[in-house]
Amino acid sequence: MSGHSKWHNIQAKKGKVDAKRGKIFTKIGKEIVVAVKQGGPSADSNPRLRDVIAKAKANNMPNDTIERSIKKASGELNAVDYETITYEGYGPAGIAVLVDVLTDNKNRSAGNVRYAFTKQGGNMGSTGCVSFMFQSKGQIVIEKKDGLDEDELMMMALDAGAEDFESEDEVYVVTTSQEDFGTVREALEAEGLEFLEAEIKMVPDTYTAIDEDTATKFQKMLDVLEDDDDVQNVYHNAEFPEGWEE
């Protein structure tokens, strides 16, 4: 099946800061704190926590770091209260952008996000200005390896309830509805599969091709956003030029 995940295209352009493991761990740690505060410290009874732990393990986050974040959120250690906010706006050339933040100071976060937009010729918009262009989907990314049969994996995913299966350069991308994400992930885990990524994200209905000049400006915007500790996720509908490198 052919989908429209563009996972490899987007992943390659997410920003060099995502290679800094410590920053990734800080952001996931915040997600764990919020998940525990909302649904309790047991992954068995807290689906959101279970999903965040799966994301943490996919990013090679040490178990003791995961446990420390859970203890912090459950009151065994001092914890900060975070607020979840999604900002919307347009990047250069009208690229639709969603920015998820977890913050203890929304004025600081709003200012930082607005600066990132305007610095590269974009602008932060009002709630709802671009979110209608995206859908909440589960996305499971599996590395291509010897012995992993594409047809078998596709049937396994579809039988478990996946909506789409796509083969990209180095990975397979399984897309699910938000509701079926946990079921599909658990079915694939039961088959012994390991994931590069497994999480709920906002997927654009369509992608917009951008030229190299716009790609350079937009990458700078992404770098600024993703270097902000409050920013958890950045979603967009840009399709970078084939073979483009910053």
UniProtKB/Swiss-Prot annotation:
Keywords: Cytoplasm, DNA-binding, Transcription, Transcription regulation
Organism: Clostridium botulinum (strain Langeland / NCTC 10281 / Type F)
Matches recorded under InterPro entries: Integrase-like_N, TACO1_YebC-like_2nd/3rd_dom, TACO1_YebC_N, Transcrip_reg_TACO1-like, Transcrip_reg_TACO1-like_dom3, YebC-like
Signal peptide range in chain numbering: none
Classification of source organism: Bacteria, Bacillati, Bacillota, Clostridia, Eubacteriales
GO biological process, one term: regulation of DNA-templated transcription
Coiled-coil residues: none
Family label: Belongs to the TACO1 family.
Family annotation (Gene3D superfamilies): 1.10.10.200, 3.30.70.980
The name this protein goes by in its record: Probable transcriptional regulatory protein CLI_3132
GO cellular component: a single term: cytosol
Subcellular location: Cytoplasm
Superkingdom to which the source organism belongs: Bacteria
Pfam families in the cross-refs: TACO1_YebC_N (PF20772), Transcrip_reg (PF01709)
GO terms assigned for molecular function: DNA binding
